[in-house]
Amino acid sequence: MKTLLLTLVVVTMVCLDLAYTRRCYNQQSSQPKTTKSCPPGENSCYNKQWRDHRGSITERGCGCPKVKPGIKLRCCESEDCNN
């Protein structure tokens, strides 16, 4: 009985870990903070900053995109790390 219970606990832990998704901030510039659960397998968050005629623009989200020259990009791999 103890072996069965231990097996169920281990299986539950493994299944819960497989369903884990990264959470990142996704608000733009100075808008109120919001978060998003990333798609399965997406383990990083990004914070992208640039300047244009409106001033400093910030974009946040899941992943680590490629950017053009002149755009500052910071990628990270912990919960809510891209603020």
From Swiss-Prot:
The keyword Secreted is assigned to this record: yes
Disulphide bonds annotated for this chain are C24-C45, C38-C62, C64-C75, C76-C81
Query: What tissues contain this protein?
Result: Expressed by the venom gland.
Q: Where in the cell is it found?
A: Secreted
InterPro entries noted in UniProt:
Snake_3FTx, Snake_toxin-like_sf, Snake_toxin_con_site, Toxin_cobra-type
Signal sequence annotation: 1-21
Q: Which residues cross the membrane?
A: none
One CC-aspect GO term: extracellular region
Main subcellular localisation: secreted
Q: Which family does the UniProt entry place this protein in?
A: Belongs to the three-finger toxin family. Short-chain subfamily. Type I alpha-neurotoxin sub-subfamily.
- This protein is called Short neurotoxin C
